[in-house]
């Protein structure tokens, strides 16, 4: 198969999330875990971006003037708060229903986000580039991880960053992030994640490195049931985040 014929889209996954689109902004609905996860990932994005671009973390709009792509944006749970930080955000998702929900919510909230029902490869082919590419909780739902990462990397400008968050392919992750989360705790609908589609860190790092990016940070993320919060951790066996940078 030629690269031109390759696709990152898993239509079954697109249909699955489209069917739940109306629940994106419900903090007690099917996307409750993402609402819980948002504070820790937003803080990580803000802190690492500010360090890279020489910004003040305490500023109300620390990402002012930066162009950001939120790929696989869903209903916009990440796009909106990043836009509130001052960034010019493009929220991209292959689901028309997700983009419709995201656009309606952003308009009602008065937050400017450029939402588009497009794929990563369509954006890359159009020559789009960004200071920051957010690839958060997406790679475990795409059809071709290597091609997806390579495509996203193409859009990172010199000196720019790519953030990736996903679930590791380990037995520990299978037990906690799939079996417990979907069958016991009922945090997620059954079938949200499939073990064979989970991604190990090296499977992300290899295509990023091949695309000229340097991996500058790795961190685990865990849920503390006592505080009811997600926190950064050195344990990357389940949830983790990676940060890549294209040299200036």
Curated annotation (Swiss-Prot):
S-adenosyl-L-methionine binds at residues 41, 72, 93, 136. It is an enzyme of class 2 (transferase). Signal peptide: none annotated. Pathway: Cofactor biosynthesis; ubiquinone biosynthesis. SUPFAM superfamilies: S-adenosyl-L-methionine-dependent methyltransferases. Its EC number is 2.1.1.222, 2.1.1.64. One of its GO terms (biological process) is methylation. It holds the Pfam family Methyltransf_23. It catalyses: a 3-demethylubiquinol + S-adenosyl-L-methionine = a ubiquinol + S-adenosyl-L-homocysteine + H(+); a 3-(all-trans-polyprenyl)benzene-1,2-diol + S-adenosyl-L-methionine = a 2-methoxy-6-(all-trans-polyprenyl)phenol + S-adenosyl-L-homocysteine + H(+). GO terms for molecular function: 2-polyprenyl-6-hydroxyphenol methylase activity; 3-demethylubiquinol 3-O-methyltransferase activity; polyprenyldihydroxybenzoate methyltransferase activity. Keywords: Methyltransferase, S-adenosyl-L-methionine, Transferase, Ubiquinone biosynthesis. CDD domains: AdoMet_MTases. PANTHER family: METHYLTRANSFERASE (PTHR43464), UBIQUINONE BIOSYNTHESIS O-METHYLTRANSFERASE, MITOCHONDRIAL (PTHR43464:SF19). NCBIfam families: UbiG (TIGR01983). Belongs to the methyltransferase superfamily. UbiG/COQ3 family. O-methyltransferase that catalyzes the 2 O-methylation steps in the ubiquinone biosynthetic pathway. This is Ubiquinone biosynthesis O-methyltransferase. The gene is ubiG.
């Amino acid at each position: 198969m030629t690269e031109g014929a390759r696709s990152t889209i898993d239509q079954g996954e697109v249909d699955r999330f489209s069917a739940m689109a109306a629940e994106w902004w419900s903090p007690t609905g099917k996307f409750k875990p993402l609402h819980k996860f948002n504070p820790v990932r937003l803080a990580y994005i803000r802190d690492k971006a500010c360090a890279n671009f020489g910004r003040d973390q305490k500023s109300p709009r620390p990402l002012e003037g930066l162009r950001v792509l939120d790929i696989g944006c869903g209903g916009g749970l990440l796009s909106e708060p990043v836009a509130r930080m001052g960034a010019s955000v493009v929220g991209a998702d292959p689901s028309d229903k997700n983009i419709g929900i995201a656009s309606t919510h952003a308009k009602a909230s008065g937050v400017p986000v450029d939402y588009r029902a497009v794929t990563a490869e369509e954006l890359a082919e159009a020559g789009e580039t960004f200071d920051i590419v957010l690839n958060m909780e997406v790679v475990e739902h795409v059809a071709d991880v290597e091609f997806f990462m390579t495509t996203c990397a193409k859009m990172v400008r010199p000196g720019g960053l790519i953030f990736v968050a996903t679930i590791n392919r380990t037995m520990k992750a299978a037990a906690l992030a799939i079996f417990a989360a979907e069958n016991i705790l009922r945090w997620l609908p059954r079938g949200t994640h499939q073990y064979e589609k989970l991604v190990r860190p090296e499977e992300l790092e290899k295509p990023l490195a091949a695309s000229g990016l340097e991996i500058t940070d790795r961190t685990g993320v865990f849920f503390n049931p006592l505080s009811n919060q997600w926190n950064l951790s050195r344990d990357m066996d389940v949830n983790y985040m990676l940060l890549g940078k294209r040299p200036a």
